[in-house]
Amino acid sequence: MLSIADIVDAVAFPFSVWRTLGGLAPEMCDGRPVYVAGNAAVSFCVTYRGERKMLKCYTRTNENLKAIYGAAYRANELCVIDMVGRHHWVDCLLMDYVEGRTLDEAICAATTEAEFLALAAGFDSMACELLSSERAHGDLKPENIIVRDDGQMVAIDWDNAYVPSFAGRRSPEIGTAAYQHPARTADMFNKHVDDYSIAFISTLLHFMAVEESAAEHYRQLHEPKFMPSELINPNGWQPTSALAEVLETFARRGMAWEYRVAQMLSSATPYLSDLKRVMGFSQSPFDGNAEDVSLEYGPHGWWGCKSGERWVIAPLYSGGFEPSEGMALLELGAYRHFISLESGDVVASFDRATNVGPLRDGVTRMRMADGQERVITREELINSPKKSIFVR
């Protein structure tokens, strides 16, 4: 059997036999090629015909690779000689090198809410594109995602991907446990195999943006604060303590679509049928010029605000009031939030023990749990120094 060292030596040796990639030169450090060894392959950064490329040499055969990568996959490309002199032809992959750092590295480097939100936005954009395609990655995790300098994200290492021609086959791998639904099996192999991973990573990034302890946990251990198995209650529909913490955090801040995606993590199945629709709201630009906005209900009995046939505020809330004076008052997880119809931002939030109504004549009245009342003007809502000023 070939060793990693055998392949590294062959790539480094200038007179190795290549079927089509003659002239390829690996990047070197202290006289040895720079490489990363994985479960079934060794990857190198190389120069080929004047361009920087990624070369991947496989230690074992994977019959799916040609369908996944097309012309970039080169079967029996490199001749490798093992320590006893036997010759082996190794399958290779040559692709454009993606500049940037892994999402794992980016998470550990992020220190502010803005940096985490930028990572979350980049991931959500990539995820929505993937959900709209007919393929799936199969092993999404921070180490398999590159963050470019412009914030865009690119998934790498598609060796366990699903493409339509694989319909009816079993998956060669079932992904990394920390980012997969515990019920995923090799028989679950279609375009939905990334559903749970996408929901999990998106939730993790948004949660770390507003919960420092989750970010610090990842920096220290390079793993999520909670595992998928901690989010699924096998005995009922009530959220586990870990999931309840996430939902409470999102509900307090009026993070509606993030809240609904997080709810899906309690699913008994890896397939999340509503994920594409709900995450799609994260990519919809807000229209601050909408007219005749009214409260309407949508799928699942969730509420939002419409202008004609178009959703101005996505139907993701558990209740609400008719918009008035440029504000919509909507409820999420028993918290009420005033949302600006000009910007779409949550301008003020009220905790579950407080009863507050919509704006009338420029004011809203808040009744607290102890029976005390307070009148709050529209200007106070808009000019609050922080969105959660009324949440204890």
Task: Walk through the language-model features, giving the residues of each.
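Juxta-kinase regulatory segment immediately upstream of eukaryotic protein kinase catalytic domains
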Residues: M1-V34, I68
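Helical subdomain adjoining the active site within ATP-dependent kinase catalytic cores
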Residues: L2, F207-S284
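ATP-binding glycine-rich loop module of kinase domains
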Residues: G31-P33, N39-A72
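Conserved structural core of kinase catalytic domains
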Residues: A71-A118, G168
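Catalytic-loop of the protein kinase fold
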Residues: A127-R148
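Activation of the activation-loop gatekeeper triad in protein kinase-fold domains
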Residues: D157-Y162
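Conserved activation segment of eukaryotic-like protein kinases, specifically the C-terminal portion
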Residues: R169-R184
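Residue-level detector of conserved, function-critical positions
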Residues: Q283-R392
